[in-house]
Amino acid sequence: NVKAKIQDSVSLCAEAGYRVMDMNFFDCTTFKLPFVTDEWEKWIYDIKDLAEKKQIEFSQAHANFYNFCDPNAENKEFLDRMVLRSIDCASILGVKWVVIHAGTDFESPMLVKDSKEKNIEYFKPVLEHAASKNVGIAIENLWDLNIAPRRRYTTTAEELVDLVDTLSTEYNNVGICWDFEHADIMK
């Protein structure tokens, strides 16, 4: 897969008059950009320097994500490293909030209860890492019509609020990203 360079996108958006952008680290992983290599620090600092020159602010970022509740998920160690790297890069860019998806325990007969427990376990070290970088984690509402009759955890506002409320008793850098398109799809 070929993906435009982030630097080209920053320049084109600046020329078009944009001043605020989102940084999508999920695509940076999917399309195997320098983000996934040992050259990631040089790459992100080059983007930071260009964004400053072009007067572009990155207001938020989307972290790499995967279904961490799936015991058979491939490349977990690599993907976990990319989640943390997303936070590191966001911090370098001055991003205050990184958006990430919750996972779903599709194998559980008690999907909501078990998914919540696994999400809490997963997000604790992620939130600690993010706090050390002065970054917040915003868990995003999901949609699941494409996998019906199965369902995903955090497709409802109630599940998402419950998860974030539970995590916020221990962490002050967790919040919600409400994706209106996802919510509209679920109407």
Can you name each region flagged by the protein language model?
Residues 1-96, 113-114, 124, 131, ...:
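N-terminal pre-domain/capping segments
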Residues 21, 114, 124-187:
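Acidic/histidine-rich catalytic cores of soluble enzymes
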